[in-house]
Amino acid sequence: MQQFREAIESGDLDAAVALFADDIVFRSPVVHAPYQGRAQVEPLLRAVARVLEDFRYTCQIGDPEGADHALVFRARVGDRELEGCDFIHRGEGGRIAEFYVMIRPLSGQLALAEAMRQQLAPSESTGA
């Protein structure tokens, strides 16, 4: 999981996406249905990277050789502070197969949801 953490912290999104399984499942903190497949998850990761300011991981939980990890983070959306956790499961071949995000407090989660809606609205309206 260290490779993923380092890729995110350095802003190397190409390296982070390269660690995703083709059939990755991403569970958003604000959308009920999961996103499935690298083609759906990659644009979300890139949008989140544009929206979250001062993003930093503060804690990593899990056996480095194990399949399941939790990466605790802090960030900001505008004037809203938030903290959250990325729960990550590595599947066969060590690729990230499941990615589940939780965020608190509600005010931070709502600010993130609105900022993400604005980021993704143009591509949704054009069908891209």
Region spans (language model):
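Short N-terminal micro-motifs specific to bacterial/archaeal maturation
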Residues: 7, 31-32, 87
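Hydrophobic pocket/interface hotspot
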Residues: 4, 16-17, 24, 37, ...
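A beta-strand edge to alpha-helix "cap/lid" segment located at domain peripheries
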Residues: 46-128
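A solvent-exposed, acidic/Ser-Thr-rich amphipathic alpha-helical stretch
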Residues: 13-15, 19-66
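Exposed alpha-helical structural elements
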Residues: 3, 15, 40, 108-111, ...
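Short acidic-aromatic low-complexity motifs
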Residues: 1-19
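A general structural-boundary detector
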Residues: 3, 28-31, 75
